[in-house]
């Protein structure tokens, strides 16, 4: 297989990608773009994403965690292993490296590759004081609105309703958060709504999520003063019900 080498300068980071198949190049280059922009100096360094062909490693410890989508998680000393029937990924934050093994049958499965990259990337960012979470992120009157829930809970559907009501929806998939003492700074990966076109009523949400992925990514800052909902959890987080 042809090895595709990709190098990106993302803010304070150098990101290196090695992939075993040319078809992975587009998936990774497209997805990694959401990191573009200024990041904390403390997070500076090099992140390496290494993709290999072969049989995926399977987690086999009794303390495995399983997800509804068929992923298995296992934490070992200094690393996180996430495995699937056709691929696996291992995040090693201390080494700044994530390694993926993908079976030939899964090379063109962009959703599987994106999920593995998201999970391992989230682990590596977490160890640098950042959080990549599966959530919907919107802006309303200068405040950030974060919608969190398990897969299938209705985040995308709620996002559509929020957009139709005039809120500035940024993403219904992944949000990158940087917590500070007084605010949570958030940036979003904008992606197309997963609903069939005949189920999406004309409105702001469709146009927001359909815009080009390579545009400047939206940013929103949630300050303590802008959060006035009851049910305080821990500043600057509040629970909105």
Predicted regions and their residues:
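Active-site flanking residues adjacent to catalytic metal/cofactor-binding acidic residues
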Residues: 172
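A noncatalytic interaction/capping subdomain that flanks phosphate/NTP-handling catalytic cores
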Residues: 1-151, 164-165, 175-241
């Amino acid at each position: 297989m042809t090895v595709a080498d990709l190098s990106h300068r993302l803010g304070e980071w150098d990101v290196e990608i090695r992939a075993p198949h040319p078809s992975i190049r587009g998936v990774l280059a497209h997805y990694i773009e959401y990191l573009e922009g200024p990041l904390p100096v403390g997070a500076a360094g090099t992140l390496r994403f290494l993709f290999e062909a072969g049989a995926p490693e399977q987690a086999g410890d009794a303390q495995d965690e399983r997800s509804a989508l068929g992923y298995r998680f296992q934490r070992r000393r200094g690393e996180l292993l996430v495995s699937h029937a056709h691929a696996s990924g291992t995040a090693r934050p201390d080494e700044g490296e994530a390694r993926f093994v993908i079976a030939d049958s899964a090379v063109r499965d962009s959703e599987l590759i994106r999920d593995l990259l998201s999970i391992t990337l989230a682990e590596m960012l977490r160890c640098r004081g950042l959080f990549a979470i599966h959530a919907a992120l919107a802006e309303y009157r200068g405040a950030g609105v974060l919608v969190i829930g398990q897969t299938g809970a209705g985040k995308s559907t709620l996002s559509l309703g929020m957009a139709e009501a005039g809120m500035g929806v940024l993403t219904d998939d992944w949000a990158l958060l940087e917590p500070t003492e007084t605010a949570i700074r958030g940036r979003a990966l904008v992606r197309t709504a997963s609903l069939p076109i005949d189920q999406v009523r004309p409105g702001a949400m469709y146009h927001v999520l359909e815009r080009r992925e390579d545009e400047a990514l939206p940013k929103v800052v949630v300050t303590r003063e802008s959060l006035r909902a009851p049910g305080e959890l821990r500043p600057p987080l509040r629970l909105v019900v």
